[in-house]
Structure formats: structure tokens, C-alpha cells
Amino acid sequence: MIDDRLKSLIKYIDSEDLVIDIGCDHALIDIYLIKNNILNNIIISDISINALNQGILNIKKNKLDNKIDARCGNGLEVLNEFDNINTILISGMGTNTILKILDNKYLNKINKLIIQSNKDYYLLRKEVIKLGFMISDEEVIVSNNKMYINIVFVRGNKKYTDIELKYGISNMKNKKIYYEYLINKYQNILLSMQDKDKYTELQNEINILKELMK
């Protein structure tokens, strides 16, 4: 059974996608994708042999050994020249780790990135766009009192404003939840802030967020 956090990623995966799931979370979403006939097969990878072994146990319980190819290793490094992958799925990792994973020559073969992170979205958007991608979808997810943002990148070139890189594209789903969280966070910081310049800067960010919510 997969939780709402993982389930929120499924709609971004199409039947023609050839997927590697990096950091495979016990293969839960991968089993779901196969059993529900969304994908015919998938490669999963995890740098932790213990986590991967748990995934392999789940795969065997569901008799999907011939559909889910489990490999232990660091991100895209598990792929070889014979693998025909065009889509990367990454969830439950920090932005710096994600960017290290994407720093790989195999990325040239990738057309779609489905990424779920819980921090450093500005850095994530800015750096992935530099790699030749543009944002096609964004959605705010709250699961077990934690907030995540799903960002789907596809190949393409598009210019974004600094506000879009910081706070997301205009049609980001459930953005009000995220903006309200940030406004409350910034307002609490202002209560104890002594630096006038930083106070003004943060107040400006709050005003921007309030405008984005309209």
C-alpha cells in the first residue's frame, strides 16, 4: 500500500515512459505501477543494499521479478549502454543529493524528470533548468504533516523570473498551502529580527507571496 505522498507522483508517469526509480523506497510505487498496468517494466536503484533488499523482498512477494529490475548503486551509475531509459523518478531526497545524481552523462538520454523534494526548491529549479529542462508541472503535497513539492521537468528551453524560481510557476497546484506556510514562517522570523535591512527584505518577500496568492 502506498501513501498519498508516493501516490501523488503516479499521474506524471505515462505508459510510454521508460523509468528508473532512484532511491526506490522499498519498491512500493514501482510495484503499484506494474500491478496497475501503468508500466510494463521499470528499473529501480538504491545506494543502500539494505533498502534495496527490502524492495527485492516486496517485489518477490508480488511475483514481479521479471518486471522490476533492482540494482544496487549510486543513481544513474547503475545504468549501462543497453538500458533504454528516458524518465527519472526521484523522491525523498534533498536537492544537493538530487543534483549530484543528475551530474551524469546518461542524463543526455533523459526527456523527463519527476522529482519530489522537501526543501531548496529555488536551487533545484535553477540548476535543473541549466541542464536543458523546463518545468511542465508543479504540485504542493502535504503528507504526515510534512510538505513536499512535486516538480516535473521536460526537455526544453524557457526563461523564468526569479520569483518563479523561488516560489514556483503560476499554475502550481495547491500553492496557497505553501505560500501560507512561508508567510507564517517569515512573519515569525520578523518578530525577533533586529536588522532593519533584512527586516525590509523579508517583509518584501511576504508582500510578494500575498500577491501570488491572489
Question: What are these model-predicted stretches?
Answer:
Residues 22-23:
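Conserved S-adenosyl-L-methionine
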Residues 9-15, 78-82, 107:
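Glycine-rich helix-loop-beta junction characteristic of Rossmann-like nucleotide cofactor-binding loops
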Residues 41-46:
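Conserved SAM-binding motif I beta-strand of class I
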Residues 1-16, 31-32, 53-82:
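S-adenosyl-L-methionine
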Residues 2-5, 86-87, 96-214:
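Class I S-adenosyl-L-methionine
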